[in-house]
C-alpha cells in the first residue's frame, strides 16, 4: 500500500461558537488552532457555528413558518386574476 495517501484520522475538539459547547470526536478535518481539553491533552480545535446543542430542531425552539401571510400578500399584489380566467 502507498504511504501518506489517506488523511490523518485523529481526535479533534469541535466548539460550537453560538452556545459555547465543546465535544471531542474523531475527524480528518485540518485545523490551525489547538486547545487543551479537560483531560490535559492538547487537541486540534475546529470552531463550528451550529451543533446539536444550538440547532433549533434539537433544542425544541423550532419556529413554524406562517405561509398564510405569503398567500395573502400574493393575492393583494396580483388579485384574483387566476380565479376569473378559470370561470
From Swiss-Prot:
Disulfide bonds: none annotated. InterPro entries: Ribosomal_bL28/bL31-like_sf, Ribosomal_bL31, Ribosomal_bL31_B, Ribosomal_bL31_sf. One of its GO terms (cellular component) is ribonucleoprotein complex. The keyword Ribosomal protein applies. GO terms for molecular function: structural constituent of ribosome. SUPFAM superfamilies: L28p-like. Keywords: Ribonucleoprotein, Ribosomal protein. Coiled coil: none annotated. Signal peptide: none annotated. One of its GO terms (biological process) is translation. PROSITE patterns: RIBOSOMAL_L31. Gene3D superfamilies: Ribosomal protein L31. Part of the 50S ribosomal subunit. HAMAP family: Ribosomal_bL31_2. Belongs to the bacterial ribosomal protein bL31 family. Type B subfamily. This is Large ribosomal subunit protein bL31B. It comes from Ralstonia nicotianae (strain ATCC BAA-1114 / GMI1000) (Ralstonia solanacearum).
Amino acid at each position: 500500500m502507498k504511504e501518506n495517501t489517506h488523511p490523518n484520522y485523529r481526535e479533534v475538539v469541535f466548539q460550537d461558537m453560538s452556545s459555547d459547547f465543546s465535544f471531542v470526536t474523531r475527524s480528518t478535518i485540518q485545523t490551525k488552532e489547538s486547545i487543551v481539553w479537560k483531560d490535559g491533552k492538547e487537541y486540534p480545535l475546529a470552531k463550528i457555528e451550529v451543533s446539536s446543542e444550538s440547532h433549533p430542531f434539537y433544542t425544541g425552539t423550532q419556529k413554524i413558518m406562517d405561509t398564510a401571510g405569503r398567500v395573502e400578500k400574493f393575492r393583494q399584489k396580483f388579485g384574483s386574476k387566476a380565479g376569473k380566467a378559470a370561470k
